[in-house]
Amino acid sequence: MLAAVCAVLFFVNGVLQLLLALGLPLGRFVLGGAYTVSPLLLRPVNLALFLAWFGCALAYLRYGSLLRRPLRERTARSIVYVSTLWLFIASVFNLFITTSDFERYVTGTLSTVACVLSMCLIWRRDRFQLCPCRISPHR
C-alpha cells in the first residue's frame, strides 16, 4: 500500500513535469515560481524529469512487490533509497527556502508526504537490514 501511494505521488510529479514540457502555465509549482511557463531551453529538462519520476514510480512498485519487472530487486531498492534522500532534500528546499507560495504549500507538501511515506516503506520492508550491528543466528 505504501509503495503504491509513493508511486502515485511520483507519477503525479512526473505528469506535472510532462505538462511543463508541453508548455502549460504551471511554472509556479517548480523552480521557486520563477517562470509561469517553462522556457524552451528548460523543456527538455522537464521531459527528462518526467522520465526519471516515471522510473522512480516503477522502482517503488517493484520495491513494494507490486511488479515483477522491469527492474531487479536490488536496483529498485537502490532507487528507492536515493529517491528518499532526494525527497528529503527537496522537502527542505520546498518548505523553507523557496519564495513561491505554490511551491511551498503544494509541491512542498507533496514531497514531504512522499518522503515520510517512503521512509515508512523502507523501515517496514528493510528494518532488519538497517541495523548494521545485528548478528545473524547462522553464525
What are these regions (language model features)?
Residues 2-18, 107, 111-117:
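Alpha-helical transmembrane segments of integral membrane proteins, especially early/N-terminal helices
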Residues 14-24, 53-60, 94-97:
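C-terminal TM-helix exit segments that contain a strictly Trp-centered aromatic cap at the helix terminus
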Residues 46-57, 87-88, 111:
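Core segments of transmembrane alpha-helices
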Residues 65-81:
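Loop-to-transmembrane helix junctions at the membrane interface
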Residues 91-106:
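Membrane-helix boundary connector in multi-pass membrane proteins
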Residues 113-130:
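Membrane-water interface at the C-terminal end of transmembrane alpha helices
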